[in-house]
Amino acid sequence: MEDSKPLTVSEVTRILKNLITGSKDLKNIWVRGEISNYSKASSGHIYFSLKDSSSLMRCTFFNYSNKNYSGKPLSDGKEVQVYGTVTLYEAGGSYNLNVARVEELGQGDILLQIEKLKQKLAAEGIFDPERKRRIPSFPKTLGIATSPSGAAIEDIIKIARSRFPGINILISPCFVQGDEAPDSIVAAIEELNHPSWGVDVIIAGRGGGSFEDLMAFNDEKVVRAYANSRIPIISAVGHQTDVLLSDFAADYSTPTPTAAAEYAVPKEEDVLQFLTQLEGRLKTSLLAKISSSKDRLRLLSGKFIFKEPMQLLNQRNQRVDEIGVRLQKAVFNKVGLARVRLERYEDLTSRMRNIFFHKKQKAEFWTTKVEDLSPPATMKRGYSILRNQKGKIIRSPEETKPEEELQVLLSGGTMQVIRKGK
């Protein structure tokens, strides 16, 4: 074994190719999966990867085969089944499926999940244009959330420095793909939002990549971090697809990191020109204000108050004195009128008191008279009342009969009597 001649890479590759091409299990087979990394060359050939939950396989759909395809346009995320033969590309040492037919099975699970999340966030108002902030025209400090080793960071810094050399740049490094990317991007954005850094605008993103490479920017946590950023944020992910949810949540989105830097950072000459124009406008406005103030001063200086200020003051003092005298008279008149009314009221009260006293005396007099003439009072003076058995008052002897029993009412009580004689 140790003395056997070592094989070259090409020899090993040819052996593998013979094994693959000689296997009936890899010829004219149907393979089902989800399209990713889709691209179409100028030659008309279509290249894409077919994947499932754990594996990825490269596919080539040559123009002489795909010209017969009449289904919906192929794109990343679509679930399809393809018919073809597995081959091995010797120069690259990788296997490939040469596709003869493609049948679309429906939209891929990933795109469906993204669409559901998009609808959910849209219903919450995350993508509403009204909540987007204006990107500052003249930022002092630019914050960048991206990979520290990618081409994106170099492009952003290069463009920013070339446009405005004096701008402050603060980098918050993060992963931009893989399982750790979502939490890392969120942490980077939150760090740049800390008030102590004084960041005016944030660029968050990465350079181009495959559909899978960009999936972190469709993660719900990342999208919400874009939307919740206290500082205006620019999405800067290099892509040609329209399904990146972070683009919708950002205050402004650009197709590349370079474009984001150009939008966020003004040119120094433009800033100087703006300041020069602003200085001119301020100077013009100030001169106009001074001229207007001079005209007003000239107009006011010709008025009476400035010519004879003491005379005007004397007139005002005289007017105050006149008003004081009138006010004093009015007060005195009011007091005098109130005094007269009070005297009239007191006189009326005295008269009413006298009338009441006389009326009371008269009432007491007649009350005494009435009481003196009442039957009980009369009987106290020696009088009596005579009644027959039926209770009728007897006023003369003719109203009684001999031997008739009668009742006598006296002051102290009653007694029974019998008439005697005729």
UniProtKB/Swiss-Prot annotation:
Q: Which gene encodes it?
A: xseA
Parts forming coiled coils: none
Please state which protein family the record places this protein in.
Answer: Belongs to the XseA family.
Record-listed E.C. numbers: 3.1.11.6
HAMAP family linked = Exonuc_7_L
NCBIfam families given for it? xseA (TIGR00237)
Q: Which reaction does it catalyse?
A: Exonucleolytic cleavage in either 5'- to 3'- or 3'- to 5'-direction to yield nucleoside 5'-phosphates
Major place of localization?
Answer: cytoplasm
Q: Where in the cell is it found?
A: Cytoplasm
- N-terminal signal peptide: none
Subunit comment: Heterooligomer composed of large and small subunits.
Q: What is this protein called?
A: Exodeoxyribonuclease 7 large subunit
The answer to whether UniProt assigns keyword Ligase to this entry is no
Q: Give any Pfam family that matches.
A: Exonuc_VII_L
The alphabetical list of record keywords is: Cytoplasm, Exonuclease, Hydrolase, Nuclease
For molecular function, the Gene Ontology terms on record are: exodeoxyribonuclease VII activity; nucleic acid binding
Q: Name one GO cellular component term.
A: cytoplasm
Q: What class of enzyme is it?
A: hydrolase
The UniProt entry, under Gene3D superfamilies, shows:
2.40.50.1010
Function in brief: Bidirectionally degrades single-stranded DNA into large acid-insoluble oligonucleotides, which are then degraded further into small acid-soluble oligonucleotides.
